[in-house]
Amino acid sequence: MENVVENQAAGHEAALSARSRAPVFVLGCGRSGTKFLYHTLLSAGGFAVYHAESNAFNLLGLRFGNLAISSNRRQLLDEYYTSKLFHRTGLDPIDIDKRVMEDCRNTGDFLRIVMEAIARKQGVNRWAESTPLHLLFLPLIKKVIPDALVVHIIRDGRDVTASLHRIGWIRPLPWDRARAFLVPAIYWRWTVGKGRRYGRALGSDYIEVHYEDLVQNPRDTLASIGRFIEHDLDYDRIQQVALGSVHNPNSSFRGDGKETEAATIGRWKRMFTPQQVRDVESSIGSLLVDTGYTLETPLTERHSPLPVRLMNFLYPLYFDFKIWLKSYTPLARIADKRRMGIAESDVGPDAKSETK
């Protein structure tokens, strides 16, 4: 598929309210359906089509420091132009260079400049963003992009746990390898809990959507999201256009073959033993119930052994500490560039943009 596709909504502008032009952030814990919902919005038309996560706040803003400093902006652009993140925009450096150097003062400015340039090139007036980790940066995002609308997609934490455990995305500490399946469960609780606290402070600019509702009752769910963002999310059109993961589900269980999104619901029941289900539900049961899910393990049986209780206490502190290190220490300036699609050897005055 080409990086930039023709947007069929181009040329059909009408008088629109400020909210109907506002950027939309589709956020959630990893493996919760953020990409699926993001591609659903893009398939509806009227949004800039960008087949990548921007990683603006969780990587670019941390790595390149204070963008009010001209030299930091220059360094950001020089490295950004060599990255897959930029290649997938379909832009040329001339499309953003002057405006970034003259007008950009923070990460929000940079993201808006890039996404608005994509939108202009495609003839639309709106953009969306779907980096899952941006859920942890909601207060900053809302500060620097005040008109941002946030759709927090929440999926059953047990299915998220099964998916994250399958791909080994979150590694346990060495002494917890025997209970590695619990680490993504605790991460889900930590991430979704923070996202909900941050989101509810945004008032009418924040909405929560369940992945299961989007998959099992798409018309009504899309109608609700459409009212929130003031955008026509026509289900039939979305199915016809079917960009990205709307057409090809992003499953971590590749051995299952091409399956529908609906087939991913409740997979944890087949993957975990009753003992593992008990431990997972003892770790995240309260948040599962708060977000509308039913538990399998009776309350009287949800008692965890001491090692599990220690994990429930220590891992959130560990996750908080990692975020603090990246946000408030020089560690971010030497962060791995792989999320940008840059190899260390690619950066330099002779670096060339990727053309494949």
What name fits each language-model region?
Residues 169-187:
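Lumenal/extracellular "mature" regions of secretory-pathway glycan-modifying transferases
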Residues 48-129, 134-135, 170-174:
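PAPS-dependent sulfation machinery
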Residues 118-121, 194-206, 276, 283, ...:
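A structural motif corresponding to the C-terminal end of an alpha-helix
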Residues 29:
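P-loop (Walker A) phosphate-binding loop of NTP-binding proteins
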Residues 35-47:
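A conserved segment at the C-terminal end of the G1
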Residues 1-18, 297-356:
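Membrane-proximal basic amphipathic "stem/tether" segments
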Residues 130-131, 141-166:
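Conserved phosphate-donor/acceptor-positioning beta-strand/loop module used by diverse small-molecule
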Residues 200-278, 282, 299-309:
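The conserved 3'-phosphoadenosine-5'-phosphosulfate
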